[in-house]
Amino acid sequence: MKLALIAGTDAAIALALRLLEAEPGAVIVSTRPHADPRIRPISSIKAFLAESFATFDAFAFIGALGICVRSLAPHLADKRTDPAVVNLDEAGRHVQSVLSGHLGGANALARRLAHALGAEPVITTASDVQELWSLDLLARTHGWTPAASPDLNAVIARFVNRRPTALLLEVRDRGTA
């Protein structure tokens, strides 16, 4: 997973450097001047996202959630294609899954980063909170290729609201005729 750690304050940079131990392939970017060669200087978060949004699989914003959301808004398209996004407070107490929790992997990333910091992961997707299957990950889990379905969100809503839900699977696994 190609991960960008976006740090806007000195405390955020310090936290990003700690995260490099758990995520050695991550790239730290910051608008703050810094002598550490591991930190890539950027002119602004807005400009960085405009040029790099499609080149990263995941973004971890360290700082205010509002900055994270406002910075991302112009680039968002669809939960099936948007990258994973998490947000951390600069003290490293909480790691919140913000965008593409299941399909993009933000929930898993939030848990992984929280574990590395001894922080609390904040996961708000209904299936995770209720400890239910993630229907949108079911096909990936089993190596299936799902057909595009505009109704998937409606099915997920029925499922997490404990309504009768049927999944029709046309699957040919190894060993089946």
How should each PLM-predicted stretch be described?
Residues V27-T31, A60-G63, N87-L88, P121-T125, ...:
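General beta-strand structural signal in soluble alpha/beta enzymes
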Residues I28-E51:
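N-terminal beta-loop-helix "entrance" segment that forms/cooperates
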